[in-house]
Amino acid sequence: MVQYFTEKGPTYNEVIEIIKKKYGKNARVMTYKTVPHGGILGLFSKDWVEVSGYVRYDIGNQQINVEDEKRKILQSIKREENSSIEDVLKEVKSLKTELAHKKENINHPTITKIEDILRENDFSENYIKDINEFIKREFSLSDLDDYERVREDVVLYIAKTIKCSGSIIDNLKKRVFILVGPTGVGKTTTIAKLAAIYGINGESKSLNIKIITIDNYRIGAKKQIQTYGDIMGIPVRAIESFKDLKDEITDSKDFDLILVDTIGKSPKDFMKLAEMKELLNACGRDAEFHLAVSSTTKTSDVKEIFHQFSPFNYKTVIFTKVDETTCVGNLISLIYEMKKVVSYVTDGQIVPHNISVAEPLTFIRRINGYRISDDAEFIKKIKSKSYY
């Protein structure tokens, strides 16, 4: 626990002596300055020295103090054997409150180490605070000495906060998959990857897939997706109007899955987003929106993207370019704090590779400082452990 202090005196050396007597040898000076002292209405004052600093108390002492408090209250209860049940219950309640307060203020080395790792991985301060509260809620002071046990449970807790939807074909109720998102996040390549893994590399059977693009503005966009389609033997249609899109969807009843590639839009271009939403309404009730976001995007910008694309009522988020970022803590924090669900992650440009169905382990493996020795055992623990 850290205690901060400010002391004053005629000279610097005298103040230091005061600090040593009051706070002991562990006291540390942060700043000092000259301040006026005495006088009348600001006149005839003398210059004194004001010193500010802190003292860190050893965790062991904190634990001893907690045990002392237990003994004191228990002795008090014993002395008052004739007290009523209500009085005893009050004493016990007071003990719980006091011990909880002391535990809350203890900065155990295990907690400090875990907080440092989370910050290094770019987790948000709110998320770190939540982890801190989880640790203090789930572990006793003696349990905190077992760093490996606490670390393992923290990793499991983090995994529980990552909500994933599974494959889009696990429960194929909506057969029109529309991918929206800002410019340059890799929507076209992602559409091609999905077409490849479900159209020509299906595990049980390949689906009958069609690709539709409404991106007729970006130079080479139509040619790019058409090339992918030709290589895979999957039909590609370029659409420009609401009527054409509606007719194309109607004429595609024999297809199991229709993948729609859209125009990249700035989340700040509200008018363009509204126009695109109106056009895509032609896909009807069979349509399902998904949002593509680059993992390299700043946290504040990702929040903006989540918010500005909300009119599309997107079901899941696809994080692209995961291979281009060194930290995923900000992504985990965002999907937890903003209650988002992740369906896929991409980590390269190669079609049909470099895409996978998102699962908690996908993100956990990328947390620097945490290692998973047995994936199967870890997944089993995720399913069995419950913190909610």
UniProtKB/Swiss-Prot annotation:
CDD domains: FlhF. Pfam families: SRP54. Its main location: membrane. Keywords: Bacterial flagellum biogenesis, Bacterial flagellum protein export, Cell membrane, GTP-binding, Membrane, Nucleotide-binding, Protein transport, Transport. It is found in: Cell membrane. GO terms for cellular component: cytosol; plasma membrane. GTP binds at residues 181-188, 261-265, 320-323. The keyword Protein transport applies. The keyword Transferase does not apply. GO terms for biological process: bacterial-type flagellum organization; protein transport; SRP-dependent cotranslational protein targeting to membrane. One of its GO terms (molecular function) is GTP binding. SMART domains: AAA, SRP54. Belongs to the GTP-binding SRP family. Necessary for flagellar biosynthesis. May be involved in translocation of the flagellum. This is Flagellar biosynthesis protein FlhF. It comes from Borreliella burgdorferi (strain ATCC 35210 / DSM 4680 / CIP 102532 / B31) (Borrelia burgdorferi).
